[in-house]
UniProtKB/Swiss-Prot annotation:
One of its GO terms (cellular component) is Toc complex. This is Protein TOC75-3, chloroplastic. Keywords: Chloroplast, Membrane, Plastid, Plastid outer membrane, Protein transport, Transit peptide, Transmembrane, Transmembrane beta strand, Transport. Residues 57-67 have a biased composition (Basic and acidic residues). Contains 3 N-terminal periplasmic polypeptide transport-associated (POTRA) domains which may serve as a binding site for the preprotein in the chloroplast intermembrane space, and provide a chaperone-like activity to prevent misfolding or aggregation in the intermembrane space. Transmembrane regions consist mainly of membrane-spanning sided beta-sheets, which are not predicted by sequence analysis tools. The keyword Nucleus does not apply. Disruption phenotype: Plants have an embryo development arrested at the two cells stage. Residues 1-79, 80-140 form a transit peptide. It is a multi-pass membrane protein. Mostly expressed in young and actively dividing photosynthetic tissues and, to a lower extent, in old leaves and roots. Particularly low levels in leaves after etiolation.
């Protein structure tokens, strides 16, 4: 048995039973763990989806050069999306061969770095353990004919490898590993099976089997290894690999270092004519070089608990063995990949014959960030969007000097997608050919068209005098919308829309909105995130203040027209918190169903006539109010989706402050606080196709007003977004209100069912509204409801019971209540 001395200890080299000593043909191994790179993608322009694909590793028997590997095997992690806000983001996992292999070899044997392989290694360009722990490509030539030759020997006899014919192709029926020390046959789940490239069912020549044995003998895993065949009755050959596992002295320290971006030194070849003294100096020189190397290396990201687990492994095992190092490698790489460091891999172990085990990791340091714009065909073009607009959306973890993390790529996808400027987004990490172990992050963007226009139409039917519709009663309506986005490449936009329910007589209810949005108010390079927005508008809505209570005849409707301008600034403190403040100036006109100005609400008389002596509709008493007021709101929303279910908390506080400018010099303070909490009742496994958790929703809302209060701004109770089971405003209109509610959501197949209970109360303030519309229209001022429902796509179908009258009804609503 050959041996050499390191630190005064004899280190055995592996031996094989073959007579061949040619080690010039070494196979290049690829790490199995690092080959699994997440691939985030979307398949449709609207809904992200998940697929899992696998690409088979290269089976070529020729050792590829590093440049060839980088060209052929460098596969990107693609992050694709669309301009629409995605509610969730999912991964595509591809089994890709990794090019992040270890650095240059460090010597011939079990000295510190093991760069070239322990026990007779030859110092190839890959890290010793990067090769040692990796499945090698199968040596069978897949391009060859599947024909094979029978062994031509009696069945069930053992044949030494050197006794096989060099002219035959042998079909391998099965492979077994036999541990000589334990005198047992190990199962296929054992990590040693990762080392073997031959496969059951494969066809191999004697030379290929000899090459396999030589590779195993020189990998450093085994002190002794042998390969023999056993003939089968069907002419195939069973292969048994018997081995004695390599071991080193016990260790009581563990160290993990990041060797990414470190220049790999090329060792000086040892002259076979060296004297023992020269060899000793040679090994000491290698040890010094390795010590300087690990001293220059950066500490890895591995946390203390994982260090503790590895130390426990070392204490429990005693001597350091190849299997133990594989377990350490698996545990270290599992932590990296669980934490999202998809490009990290263990490439080497050093100091194995000292009291310290050094684990070398290439973590995937980002060396460069590249942003590219592409046309529809994927050609690189000069984009309209200014690059700083994209850069400010990237998390710092995706910049040069940080370790690439899949979560940072996911966050970059979400942030860039929220700009609404791109139809497709890709975040591709690829190996840096100029920096060993480095990662170049490429961000590829396809821009949306800057200008767009849309026309939507709808038809309404107005009954004629006899109650039945006529041809003339069909009214075409709809809206026209246009948008010019990304002005000057700075994400500024101009949007406009015009809406009417009757294109034939648009003057009846024509509404419009023209809005300009100016982000990066403090400059695109300023980290402060403020957006200026201004708009002019004209809208019409039915007022729920003038609504009858239970048992009251139908109350003639009052429409509220608002026309004016608004300007505000929104400052995003974080992704979850924002603050908006601005000025609103508007003219409010109240009209009856004939579009005439109505200064008072109307009532139906017992005689069937209509009385116009109801509560005043405006503060001025003329049916027309003008006012200016400040408006501010702060929102904190940390909700998230868990398999499609909303979980978290949302809080909104809004204040409107009158300035005493306008009709009757209105001065008031109107404030609202809304709090909603979504409580996850059970932990569930997250992922595509997984069931969402049951959720308990708790909701509270308070609104109050001090000072002047026109009736159209009073708080109303009742309706699908107040207290369900009642019509809009059916419970009352008040100066102060309180609402509470609870809802439990239980997932069922592809949807969820829910049960709810809600209550609303005017806190005795209905009488303080001018004209007391609550009393005039015989409303109670408070009410409760309960019920259950099911979500059908975008529609809520629910049965709600009005607790005041004890009657129930079925409702169909769009959207969510909370």
């Amino acid at each position: 048995m050959a041996a050499f001395s390191v630190n005064g200890q004899l280190i055995p080299t592996a031996t094989s039973s073959t007579a061949s000593t040619s080690l010039s043909s070494r196979r290049k191994f690829l790490s199995p763990s690092s080959s699994r790179l997440p691939r985030i993608s979307t398949q449709s322009p609207r809904v992200p989806s998940i697929k899992c694909s696998k690409s088979l590793p290269n089976r070529d028997t020729e050792t590829s050069s590093k440049d060839s590997l980088l060209k052929n095997l460098a596969k990107p992690l693609a992050v694709a999306s669309v301009s629409s806000a995605a509610s969730f983001f999912l991964f595509r996992i591809s089994n890709l061969p990794s090019v992040l292999t270890g650095g240059g070899g460090g010597g011939d044997g079990n000295f510190g770095g093991f760069g070239g392989g322990g026990g007779g290694g030859d110092g190839n360009d890959g890290g010793f353990w990067g090769k040692l722990f990796s499945p090698s490509p199968a040596v069978a030539d897949e391009e060859q004919s599947p024909d094979w030759d029978s062994h031509g020997l009696p069945a069930n006899i053992v044949v030494q490898l050197n006794k096989l014919s060099g002219f035959k192709k042998y079909k391998v029926s099965d492979i077994m590993f036999f541990d000589r020390r334990r005198q047992t046959t190990i199962g296929t789940e054992d990590s040693f099976f990762e080392m073997v490239s031959i496969r059951p069912g494969g066809v191999y020549t004697k030379a290929q089997l000899q090459k396999e044995l030589e590779t195993l003998a020189t990998c450093g895993m085994f002190e002794k290894v042998d390969l023999e065949g056993k003939t089968k009755p069907d002419g195939t050959l069973g292969v048994t690999i018997s081995f004695a596992e390599s071991t080193w002295q016990s260790a009581d320290r563990f160290r993990c270092i990041n060797v990414g971006l470190m220049v790999q030194s090329k060792p000086i070849e040892m002259d076979s004519d060296m004297t023992d003294k020269e060899k000793l100096e040679y090994y000491r020189s290698l040890e010094k070089d390795y010590k300087r190397r690990i001293d220059r290396a950066r500490p890895c990201l591995l946390p203390a608990p994982v260090y503790g687990e590895v130390m426990q492994m070392l204490r429990d095992q005693g001597k350091v063995s190849a299997r133990l190092l594989q377990r350490i490698r698996d545990r270290v790489q599992k932590w990296y990949h669980d934490e999202g460091y998809a490009c990290a891999q263990v490439v080497n172990f050093g100091n194995l014959n000292t009291k310290e085990v050094v684990c070398e990791v290439v973590e995937g340091d980002i060396t460069q960030l590249v942003i590219q714009f592409q046309d529809k065909l994927g050609n690189v073009v000069e984009g309209n969007t200014q690059v700083p607009v994209v850069r400010r959306e990237l998390p710092k973890q995706l910049r040069q000097g940080y370790v690439f993390n899949i979560e940072a790529g996911k966050k970059a996808l979400s942030n860039i997608n929220s700009l609404g400027l791109f139809s497709n987004i890709e975040v591709n990490p690829r190996p840096d050919e100029k920096n060993e172990g480095g990662i170049i992050v490429e961000i590829k963007l396809k821009e949306l068209e800057q200008k767009s226009a849309e026309v939507s139409t709808e038809w309404s039917i107005v009954p004629g005098r006899g109650g039945a519709p006529t041809l003339a009663s069909f009214q075409p309506g709809g809206s026209v919308t246009f948008e010019h986005r990304n002005l000057q490449g700075l994400n500024r936009s101009l949007m406009g829309s015009v809406t009417t329910s009757n294109f034939l007589n648009p003057q009846d209810d024509l509404s419009f909105k023209l809005e300009y949005v100016h982000p990066y108010l403090d400059g695109v390079y300023n980290p402060r995130n403020r957006t200026f927005k201004t708009s002019c508008f004209n809208s019409r809505k039915l007022s729920p203040v003038f609504t009858g209570g239970p048992g009251v005849e139908e109350v003639p409707p009052i429409w509220v027209d608002r026309a004016g301008v608004k300007a505000n600034i929104t400052e995003n403190f974080t992704r979850q918190s924002k603050f908006t403040y601005g000025l609103v100036m508007e003219e409010i006109t109240t009209r009856d169903e004939s579009s005439h100005i109505a200064a008072n609400g109307q009532r139906l008389l017992p005689s069937g006539g209509i009385s116009a002596d109801g509560p005043p509709t405006t503060l001025s008493g003329t049916g027309v109010d003008r006012m200016a007021f400040l408006q501010a709101n702060i929102t904190r929303d940390n909700t998230k989706f868990v398999n499609g279910a909303v979980v978290g908390q949302r809080t909104v506080f809004q204040v409107d402050q009158g300035l005493g400018i306008g009709s009757k010099f209105p001065f008031f303070n109107r404030h609202q606080l809304t709090m909603t909490k979504f409580i996850q009742l059970r932990e569930v496994e997250q992922g595509a196709g997984k069931s969402p958790p049951p959720v308990l929703v708790l909701h509270g809302h308070y609104g109050g007003c001090v000072g002047d209060l026109p009736s159209y701004d009073a708080f109303v109770l009742g309706g699908p977004y107040s207290v369900r089971g009642y019509n809009m405003g059916e419970l009352g209109a008040a100066r102060n209100i309180a609402e509470v509610g609870a809802e439990i959501r239980i997932p069922v197949k592809n949807t969820h069912v829910y049960a709810f209970v809600e209550h609303g109360n005017d806190l005795g303030s209905s009488k303080d509204v001018k004209g007391n519309p609550t009393a005039v229209y015989r409303r109670t001022g408070q009410g409760s409801s309960y019920g259950a429902g099911v979500k059908l796509g975008l529609v809520r179908a629910e049965y709600a019971v009005d607790h005041n009258n004890g009657t129930g009804a079925l409702f169909f609503r769009f959207g969510e209540r909370y």
